[in-house]
Amino acid sequence: MAGPGSPRRASRGASALLAAALLYAALGDVVRSEQQIPLSVVKLWASAFGGEIKSIAAKYSGSQLLQKKYKEYEKDVAIEEIDGLQLVKKLAKNMEEMFHKKSEAVRRLVEAAEEAHLKHEFDADLQYEYFNAVLINERDKDGNFLELGKEFILAPNDHFNNLPVNISLSDVQVPTNMYNKDPAIVNGVYWSESLNKVFVDNFDRDPSLIWQYFGSAKGFFRQYPGIKWEPDENGVIAFDCRNRKWYIQAATSPKDVVILVDVSGSMKGLRLTIAKQTVSSILDTLGDDDFFNIIAYNEELHYVEPCLNGTLVQADRTNKEHFREHLDKLFAKGIGMLDIALNEAFNILSDFNHTGQGSICSQAIMLITDGAVDTYDTIFAKYNWPDRKVRIFTYLIGREAAFADNLKWMACANKGFFTQISTLADVQENVMEYLHVLSRPKVIDQEHDVVWTEAYIDSTLPQAQKLTDDQGPVLMTTVAMPVFSKQNETRSKGILLGVVGTDVPVKELLKTIPKYKLGIHGYAFAITNNGYILTHPELRLLYEEGKKRRKPNYSSVDLSEVEWEDRDDVLRNAMVNRKTGKFSMEVKKTVDKGKRVLVMTNDYYYTDIKGTPFSLGVALSRGHGKYFFRGNVTIEEGLHDLEHPDVSLADEWSYCNTDLHPEHRHLSQLEAIKLYLKGKEPLLQCDKELIQEVLFDAVVSAPIEAYWTSLALNKSENSDKGVEVAFLGTRTGLSRINLFVGAEQLTNQDFLKAGDKENIFNADHFPLWYRRAAEQIPGSFVYSIPFSTGPVNKSNVVTASTSIQLLDERKSPVVAAVGIQMKLEFFQRKFWTASRQCASLDGKCSISCDDETVNCYLIDNNGFILVSEDYTQTGDFFGEIEGAVMNKLLTMGSFKRITLYDYQAMCRANKESSDGAHGLLDPYNAFLSAVKWIMTELVLFLVEFNLCSWWHSDMTAKAQKLKQTLEPCDTEYPAFVSERTIKETTGNIACEDCSKSFVIQQIPSSNLFMVVVDSSCLCESVAPITMAPIEIRYNESLKCERLKAQKIRRRPESCHGFHPEENARECGGAPSLQAQTVLLLLPLLLMLFSR
């Protein structure tokens, strides 16, 4: 398809082939001489097009008017250089106060819970009708409320994304595998009812709070505000608060763990499957402050990951998943030599502790086996007695109890716990027992450590799946504290009652950051004590495969993976170590879906956020990004110009805090400012400095509205409706928009709308057109076409923007950017018209873009095509179309290649999978398998016929097959940037049988280049240059080094691994299958057989 305005006929291809054949025959083996493309003609075309398109852009954007208006105020403004160190300290202080408010709310819940429990006396016969979150408002067939399902008033609340909630009461969720009326549950629910008034009081004190909750050690979960819980698509609510990170982190101290798995011959079949699931469940309970290794043993030791022989590794998600994959490779044979395994485990813990790299706190050995023939007291005497600093937790797999006594003795003699796991359904409940044992020293110390989790998306809560913003699921951190029994008679037992917590959306942090003080490219970011990102504009949580999905390792992205130019981790390590200081480096920031790169120098300022494990950093780009100016106008002037209908403000910026009072939550930021300035809402808290600058920008930019309106009303202007939108944005987040066509006629309906995150002011960055314009020479326009997210670029518009500077010098801040969006067809027609001009008096041009022998292109400073005779090439990278020419431009220095790295990429990988074995590691499949196993046992008991092997075979005997999945990976890819100093150049490329000539000429006052290429020489021997990312593959030895490598981290400040007064007599016993459990499972059995 020919581009708009290109007159080339469809028969050209055939004619060209015939001419080429005749020419080749005439020349034989003689290399053809290249066609000479006159530079002067191309220069004329470029000048004509540049003048025309700049005239249009300047006229319709009003750039000259706006520049003039700011110049008029030049003497009335004060320019300041931003003090980055003072700025980051102030921001850290603001965040510290915000975090402190959240932790104080949690502390009040702790005090109330402990007081209520102290006053309560356990009553095994207690009958209490509580609000069960699953059953509330449910009726039977006669219309009566179900038991525990009383009427519970719910109303949509805008603070909770309009979810129906009850802000007067909490309700209670009980795990599916637990009995709703178990005496322990009923008693716990009864005394914890007193938390309701504290929940409400906390919300009154701090209306920005969202979910508050108490997770009981008995398993129930009390949540405020109360909400109805709905089962997932499988009819199950798998949530158990005790295996959530906030619960585990608050309940226990950091730990070093060695997991020993018996793989002797007696562990074959279902026992090994249960053992693997037990290991997987233990891994689920380990967090970023823990360290672990897994050793399988029979007559020999088999490290699950041989590379990590004799050491421990951090329990981050990546490492845990790596070990899970290796679990599938375990198989049972031989005899079990537990003494060898225990010796190895003790030695590893001792050696690793001496390196100073681990948790330097709790230590434990987890033993998973179907029996032990000895108590191995000589080993314990050698390594662990009398202090018993290493706890032994033993898990007996299977129904036989012949060797239970030895395993129980080992656990009890080493301050551990013994459990028996007979079925897959038993795994999770039994694994979690060890957490409450590890919590004992903390409880005895009565140390209510405040813990903050890493950033995460909690999608297990039904309401959390709906609590999303425009960008997808809400990223949050949780502040939590443990709740202890204060009854004197149980003090030495160290009884943990549970954990209280509240969620803090990360966007709450961003509200404390004055984006206008950070400059166009500036940003704030925060990391945890492990160096993982809490918030950073480059953190990408989701990937797209059919629909948007969470990346598996999104919560453990290290700062060094986004600020990758800091190869020595200088910035990262200083922040992890809670230093205050400054660091500078050249950075390569990608924009526009990673296809373009801006090279700049950033100054980083950092400090710690006291009372939390977090550190805060601020990045300011050198040059205009380091300067700020203050203008001054009267409130009356500013208010008048804010009333104009074309004015809007950045909704994600905090001009006024509308969260403090419920009556303000419905206000937009612009509405809040107007009420504040008019004195109608004295309770509104606003940023006076920012609002003063908003008023200044509103006054200075106000005349442009009338200017745009006059253009729109002039019928002789823009008659072909080529220019559709004019827009401006200022450093304060103020925007103005004018449509030159009806809204329904806009080619790009999404432009500047809330969903168009790249092109509007948001919490992370200025609009793309603003950022790119700021890097252009003042007075010039930057032109671009938006990239489609799909495989084919469907853009039909061109965006042009330019920056407005206050002063004609380098330190001048960029105060605003203005631009237009026009139809691509209109833009391309202007190009083709300009390319027909020539200086010849007789009107006969020596060369034309209409000629068969040349191809004409218009490309931007990153090498992307805006105009080509083949319309389908629009938006493509020039190197993919003209590889030989792009290669020559790189060699000549007209363009330079910049290598970029993506450490958050997702790559396709072929994995060998067995639906059965791997599926068992999924909780739901595991549960279904458990139900099948229990049913088998019942059948065994009733008919004494072994159906187990038959029933279980469908879960294990499925053939291995290759499955293609997307997995986290590292990639390398190029970006290209033009050299500004080179305005024009010509070149010749020696190909196999011809010489290819070309001319490249910069379009004046723009980021564009006209490229005219000799098309008679195809030069197919030179491969196209692509921008496709290449996966960085690591060989086995490098993979091993990366596994072993441990970046600098800071351990949590508190540790409660041991207490001499601990009463370790409660150390477990063999559970029995209760009738009530069978009754609970019957509905699930029916569901299973109906599938």
Curated annotation (Swiss-Prot):
It is found in: Membrane. Disulfide bonds join 412-1055. The modification Phosphotyrosine is found at residue 924. Glycans are attached at residues 166, 309, 553, 632, 793. Only detected in brain. Not present in lung, testis, aorta, spleen, jejunum, ventricular muscle and kidney (at protein level). According to PubMed:11687876, it is brain-specific, while according to PubMed:11245980, it is widely expressed. Its main location: membrane. GO terms for cellular component: GABA-ergic synapse; presynaptic active zone membrane; voltage-gated calcium channel complex. Keywords: Calcium, Calcium channel, Calcium transport, Disulfide bond, Glycoprotein, Ion channel, Ion transport, Membrane, Metal-binding, Phosphoprotein, Signal, Transmembrane, Transmembrane helix, Transport, Voltage-gated channel. Residues 1-28 form the signal peptide. This is Voltage-dependent calcium channel subunit alpha-2/delta-3. It comes from Homo sapiens (Human). The gene is CACNA2D3.
